[in-house]
Structures are given as C-alpha cells and as structure tokens.
Amino acid sequence: MAISKKSSLYLPIFTFITMLLMVVNKVSSSTADANALHFTFNQFSKDQKDLILQGDATTGTDGNLELTRVSSNGSPQGNSVGRALFYAPVHIWESSAVVASFDATFKFLIKSPDSEPADGITFFIANIDSSIPSGSGGRLLGLFPDANIIKNSTTIDFNAAYNADTIVAVELDTYPNTDIGDPNYPHIGIDIKSIRSKKTTRWNIQNGKVGTAHINYNSVGKRLSAIVSYPNSDSATVSYDVDLDNVLPEWVRVGLSATTGLYKETNTILSWSFTSKLKSN
C-alpha cells in the first residue's frame, strides 16, 4: 500500500481512516490521496468495514457481495433493493477546470429461476450522503425516487418524478419497463439524473454465468463508456458524452446497486475495482 500527498503535509481524515480499514479488511490493493483513489476487492469479508451497505446488501457469503436478498439456500427473493458504496469519497472535479478520469470493473453473476429475470445491477456515482430513495425498488434500480405518474404523463411530469439531481449511472437492466422509457429488451444504459437512459444498447444476458462490466470515463473527451461481456461471447458496448462537473458535486461516492421485483434474480458481485485521477480538461 502506497500513500502520496502533493497538496498538503496532512492526510485528510477520511483518507487516513479509509487506509486503516483497508488494512483490516485486506483489500488486495489500494492507494489514496486528495486527487486520486484506487481500490480492488477480489473477495468480500463478512465484516467489510470499508463498504457502506444499504438496504438488503450483504457480504461474506462465499466471499461475495450480494446486493439483493437471497434465502439460506441461495435462492433469489423478490421485492428487494440493496446498495454498496465505497467508504472514501472521490474528488471528481475541482474549480480549476480539472475533472477526474476513472475506470471501474466488476464481475457479476445474475441467476434467475424465472423465465424473465428482474431487475438489474448498476454502477453509480452519487453525492457523499446518498441513501436509497423511498420506493426505488424494482424498475428504479435503487437510485431514483418513486412517484405516482399516470401512464400518459408528459415528459416534463415524467422527468420531475423520476429524477435524482446527483446521480450518474450505468445500468445492466435485465427487465424492460417500456412505460419508463426502456427499450423492449434487456439492455445496458447510461443514466444521467434520470431513470430514462440517455443511451442504450441490447444486452444478451447469460443466466447463471459470470460476466464482466467495465466502465470508463475519459475527462478529456468527456465520454462515459461501458462494456459488458461474458467469456467467448460478443460484448455489449454503450457510450455517451457528458461533462461531469455540470452534473455531479465536487465530492462523490461510487457504488453498486441492484433490485428485484415481482420477478427475481441473484445480483452477486464477485470482484470490484475502481481507479480515479484528476486530469486537466
């Protein structure tokens, strides 16, 4: 573990505490300073103190992170929502026209006894005090607040209801909800402050197989990209141009979320890594 600090002789309190927690929980590798963050989880312990677990999320079962509720025999349960956020905040931009680039990778296992699994997994970026919004289960993926919207609501009404001012997410959506703007098939989507994705691409889920999601943000080109793949299969790729300093606060947390609804699936995370560093525009 290496620590570097250029802007001050004193480590921020959150960084110092985070480093101690990493040692205790044996995160395989990590570095942190005021302008960069790196972590890697190759497995998850039962008492994983450097993660903030919300809702039904648990760690330690076979060394994995279970984002949604499972029974004692490992069967997925319906109507469940869970999230896991990394303990240390990320410095995503600063006033001197500097924005962070980042890479995130996680391996996941989605397994469902149903013919149609639901509802999906996301990688998300939110304000540092983010919690699960009320009624955000199922199609809202643990990220966006629920609201009673009539089927033929206007775009203005829709956006006002399904909006979160400080959320950027990549969704691995396993169940199409066309009434909230989903395409009529499972898909990868990029969400900017709304559950209605800015860009989507078809995703062929492989039930019960381990997949890999890789998310990249290039701050120079201002492009957010995601690639989701299974071994020996074609990848699903989606990208969207967004200026994060116009969307997110200066300090954020990164996390993973998942939900189930009437239909269900396991939302198991086997590993997770993240690297960010501030770069000039």
UniProtKB/Swiss-Prot annotation:
Prosegment residue ranges: 149-163
InterPro entries: ConA-like_dom_sf (IPR013320), L-lectin (IPR016363), Lectin_LegA_CS (IPR000985), Lectin_legB_Mn/Ca_BS (IPR019825), Legume_lectin_dom (IPR001220), Leguminous_Lectin (IPR050258)
Binding positions (Ca(2+)): 119, 173, 175, 177, 182
Signal peptide, first to last residue: 1-29
Protein family (similarity comment): Belongs to the leguminous lectin family.
Maturation and modification: The mature chain consists of residues 164-281 followed by residues 30-148. Concanavalin A-like lectins of the Diocleinae subtribe undergo proteolytic processing referred to as circular permutation. The propeptide is split into an N-terminal and a C-terminal part, the gamma and beta chain, respectively. These are then religated in beta-gamma order to form the mature alpha chain. The beta and gamma chains can often be detected in cell extracts.
CDD domains recorded: lectin_legume_LecRK_Arcelin_ConA
Residues that bind a carbohydrate: 139, 175, 262-263
Summary of the function given for this chain in its UniProt record: D-mannose-specific lectin.
Pfam families, per the entry: Lectin_legB (PF00139)
Protein name stated in the entry: Lectin CaBo
Subunit note: Equilibrium between homodimer and homotetramer.
Note in the entry: Binds one manganese (or another transition metal) ion and one calcium ion. The metal ions are essential for the saccharide-binding and cell-agglutinating activities.
Keywords linked to the UniProt accession: Calcium, Lectin, Manganese, Mannose-binding, Metal-binding, Signal
Residues binding Mn(2+): 171, 173, 182, 187
Cleavage (site feature) positions: 148-149, 163-164
GO molecular function: carbohydrate binding; D-mannose binding; metal ion binding
